[in-house]
Amino acid sequence: MIEKIYRTYLEIKSLNDLNEVKRPTEDYSINLVDPIDFQLNKFFYKQIGKKYFWKDRLEWSNQTWIEYVSDEKLSTYVLKNNEEIVGYFELLFHKTKEEAEIAYFGILEDYFGKNLGGYLLSQAIKKAFELDINRVWLHTCSLDHKNALKNYLSRGMTIFKSEILKTKIA
């Protein structure tokens, strides 16, 4: 079935514009994945993405995953509750444009409803601005979690582009 998908691009241009959500408890931490671990990125992509029709990377070989996570422009961060993994985000830095893209972002379904999305997004934005950039951006679509767009806007991001795509959903 062909379906209309609404894609929205959002940005934040200053850390001063961030409406930060603080860490829920001391049990939660944000950790840079170092050394890189393509299996972790692959796990999150599959587990979080299965509900939201993330498909473009499903056919990637392990070698393609390794090359992707080895790119010096990419940083992956994991949200943990003590030692249990909860969610993640991938930051892609575009040095020449002095910007960072939140390429992928999400929380495992077992942790839905715990108000962790706002905290994770706040941390993604803060980590991106640590590298002296002028803008953090991302895109979301109507297939993503029902609270995704609300979360982005609540953190201080603004819409800079919208589009309608037609795609096959199966």
Labelled PLM ranges:
Residues 112, 138-148, 160, 165-170:
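Conserved beta-strand-loop-alpha-helix junction that forms the acyl-donor binding cleft
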